[in-house]
């Protein structure tokens, strides 16, 4: 038989439990609201337009700012390009090992790897690594030519469920980043969702997915962007991008030492054509997202 004191204790516990749950939910919502405010202030202070789409792949919690607005892709398209090559390789077994010949006329600004191999050419796989890890522009154009042009990469994006990504031109023209120009753009939300499907989901076969992840983890261009914004011990697999109007981007996956990875896309652009890139803003946005989603 339950005593009056026990009954009162049980009733009090029953009353407190919903309040505890409400406090937890409020705390999480408050943290996210604070992070959203921090991103808005970061954008205001930068003088540009900032787009952010991050989500914790374990909890599903998202943090967004202008996540559904279009931003210039710049070199972040190269992640989708490499994925399209990997998908094609499942139907063309010799593709990755195929050696592509090219001449000095194919070299354009920022082609640090291809310029060293004009005499011998490079394999498709080596070009994928060069365009992801060093943002080699000539390699990107040669890969686009091998696949069939920018429209082929857009078609690949549609095939994995991305209705937003569009690639219209090649390097370096695709980096004009003119405000309001829909060419060569995507939204942070669409890019993050595609990255999740490609790197962590089943849009690619297991071997192709592992290869894409390996290329991304070997990126060398993120020192002042995602890498500058994550805590010590985190791994970053990403693709950066830069263009006119101060366009400064970074997209990819952030792996904590323990726990679920965070998928993140950050895009920044300015109204002035001669604006300088702001890698520091990308790093600051990364810190805000990581603190909110994985803290």
Language model features: what each stretch is:
Residues 2-15, 30-40, 146, 150, ...:
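Structured C-terminal helix/loop/strand segments within mature extracytoplasmic catalytic/sensor domains
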Residues 25-72, 288-292:
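Beta-lactamase-like hydrolase cores
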Residues 46-49, 144-200:
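Mid-domain, small-residue-enriched loop/turn segments at the edges of structured enzyme/sensor domains
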Residues 51-56, 64, 80, 101, ...:
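Soluble periplasmic/extracytoplasmic beta-strand elements of cell-envelope proteins
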Residues 60, 72-100, 264:
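Active-site SXXK
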Residues 91-116:
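Short, glycine/proline-biased beta-turn/loop segments that scaffold the active-site neighborhood
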Residues 107-143, 150, 184:
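Conserved catalytic neighborhood of penicillin-recognizing serine enzymes
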């Amino acid at each position: 038989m339950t005593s009056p004191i026990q009954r009162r204790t049980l009733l009090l516990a029953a009353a407190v439990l919903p309040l505890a749950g409400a406090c937890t939910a409020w705390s999480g919502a408050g943290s996210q609201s604070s992070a959203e405010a921090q991103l808005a202030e970061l954008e205001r202070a930068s003088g540009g337009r900032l787009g952010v789409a991050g989500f914790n792949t374990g909890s599903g919690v998202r943090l967004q700012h202008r996540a559904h607005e279009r931003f210039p892709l710049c070199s972040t398209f190269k992640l989708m390009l490499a994925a399209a090559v990997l998908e094609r390789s499942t139907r063309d077994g010799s593709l990755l090992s195929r050696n592509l010949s090219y001449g000095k006329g194919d070299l354009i600004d920022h082609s640090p790897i291809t310029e060293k191999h004009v005499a011998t050419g490079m394999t498709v796989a080596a070009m994928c690594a060069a365009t992801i890890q060093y943002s080699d522009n000539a390699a990107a154009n040669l890969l686009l030519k091998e696949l069939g042009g920018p429209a082929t990469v857009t078609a690949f994006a549609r095939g994995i469920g991305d209705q937003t990504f569009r690639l219209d031109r090649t390097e370096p023209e695709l980096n004009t980043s003119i405000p309001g120009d829909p060419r060569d753009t995507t939204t942070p939300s669409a890019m993050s969702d595609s990255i999740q499907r490609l790197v962590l989901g089943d849009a690619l076969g297991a071997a192709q997915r592992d290869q894409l992840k390996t290329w991304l983890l070997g990126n060398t261009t993120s020192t002042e962007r995602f890498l500058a914004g994550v805590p010590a011990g985190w791994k970053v697999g990403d693709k950066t991008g830069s263009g006119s109007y101060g366009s400064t981007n970074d997209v990819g996956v952030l792996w904590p030492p323990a726990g679920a990875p965070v998928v993140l896309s950050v895009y920044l652009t300015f109204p002035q054509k001669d604006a300088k890139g702001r890698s520091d803003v990308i790093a600051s946005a990364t810190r805000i997202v990581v603190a909110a989603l994985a803290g």
